[in-house]
C-alpha cells in the first residue's frame, strides 16, 4: 500500500503528537538538512533577508519541506552562486501522523476489524504551522533581492494553502532594523557573533564597558 496523499493530513485537527516512548516506530523525516549555502558567512556580509510566511494554520509534510528546500536551493545556486547566500528552513516536522490500514483484497472482511481498534500506526511526520509563522528564510547581498523573491516563489508551489513573501526590514537573520544596524555596531552596542549578533545593554558592570570601549 502506497503513501496516503498529504491532502488527507492538511488541517490541524488533533493535538500535537510527537515521537516519544509511547509513540514508537516513527519513520524518519524526509528533510534532514535545514541550513544551506554559506552558513558561516559573517553577519555583515549578507544584509538582505527574505522570508516565506504562512497565511494559513495547517500541516506541512516533511516531503513538501524537502521538495521546497531543493527547489529554492537549486535556483539560488544557479543565480547567486554556491557561496552567495545562506538559506534556512525554519520549520521542523515533529508531529506524527497515523494511518489505519484497510485491506482491499478478496476475503479482507474475515481478516480486518473495520473501525474497531482504529488507532492507526505512524505513517510519517509533518510540521504544524501558524498564520504569520516563517517557513523559510534566505539572507544574501542587497543586489540579489529579485533572485530571493523568485526562489521563494518557486518553493511556494510545493506547499498547500497560501504563503506570502516578505523582504525584511531587519538586517539578515537578526532582529535589529537595517537602517540602525551599522550605527549600533559602530557604537559597540552590537557585537557580531557568527550569523547573529550579541546585544550589549547600556547598564551593567562599568569594568566590562571600559574593556569594550578601550
Swiss-Prot record:
The keyword Calcium does not apply. Almost testis-specific. Also expressed in pre- and postmenopausal ovary. It is found in: Cytoplasm. One of its GO terms (cellular component) is nucleus. Keywords: Cytoplasm, Differentiation, Disease variant, Meiosis, Ribonucleoprotein, Ribosomal protein, Spermatogenesis. InterPro entries: Ribosomal_uL16 (IPR047873), Ribosomal_uL16_CS_euk_arc (IPR018255), Ribosomal_uL16_dom (IPR016180), Ribosomal_uL16_euk_arch (IPR001197), Ribosomal_uL16_sf (IPR036920). SUPFAM superfamilies: Ribosomal protein L16p/L10e. GO terms for biological process: cell differentiation; male meiosis I; ribosomal large subunit assembly; spermatogenesis; translation. Belongs to the universal ribosomal protein uL16 family. Testis-specific component of the ribosome, which is required for the transition from prophase to metaphase in male meiosis I. Compensates for the inactivated X-linked RPL10 paralog during spermatogenesis. The ribosome is a large ribonucleoprotein complex responsible for the synthesis of proteins in the cell. The male germ cell-specific ribosome displays a ribosomal polypeptide exit tunnel of distinct size and charge states compared with the classical ribosome. This is Ribosomal protein uL16-like. The lineage of its organism: Eukaryota, Metazoa, Chordata, Craniata, Vertebrata.
Amino acid at each position: 500500500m502506497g503513501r496516503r496523499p498529504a491532502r488527507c493530513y492538511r488541517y490541524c485537527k488533533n493535538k500535537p503528537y510527537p515521537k516519544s516512548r509511547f509513540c514508537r516506530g516513527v519513520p524518519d523525516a524526509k528533510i534532514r538538512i535545514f541550513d544551506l549555502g554559506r552558513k558561516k558567512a559573517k553577519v555583515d556580509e549578507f544584509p538582505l533577508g527574505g522570508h516565506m510566511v504562512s497565511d494559513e494554520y495547517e500541516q506541512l509534510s516533511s516531503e513538501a519541506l524537502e521538495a521546497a528546500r531543493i527547489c529554492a536551493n537549486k535556483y539560488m545556486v544557479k543565480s547567486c552562486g554556491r557561496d552567495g547566500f545562506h538559506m534556512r528552513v525554519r520549520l521542523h516536522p515533529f508531529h506524527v501522523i497515523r494511518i489505519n490500514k484497510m485491506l482491499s483484497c478478496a476475503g479482507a472482511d474475515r481478516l480486518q476489524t473495520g473501525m474497531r481498534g482504529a488507532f492507526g500506526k505512524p505513517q510519517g511526520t509533518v510540521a504544524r504551522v501558524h498564520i504569520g509563522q516563517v517557513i523559510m528564510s534566505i539572507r544574501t547581498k542587497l543586489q540579489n533581492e529579485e533572485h530571493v523573491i523568485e526562489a521563494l516563489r518557486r518553493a511556494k508551489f510545493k506547499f498547500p494553502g497560501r504563503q506570502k513573501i516578505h523582504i525584511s526590514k531587519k538586517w539578515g537573520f537578526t532582529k535589529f532594523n537595517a537602517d540602525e544596524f551599522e550605527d549600533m555596531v559602530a557604537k559597540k552596542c552590537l557585537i557580531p557573533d557568527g550569523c547573529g549578533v550579541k546585544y550589549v545593554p547600556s547598564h551593567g558592570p562599568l569594568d566590562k564597558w571600559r574593556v569594550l570601549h578601550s
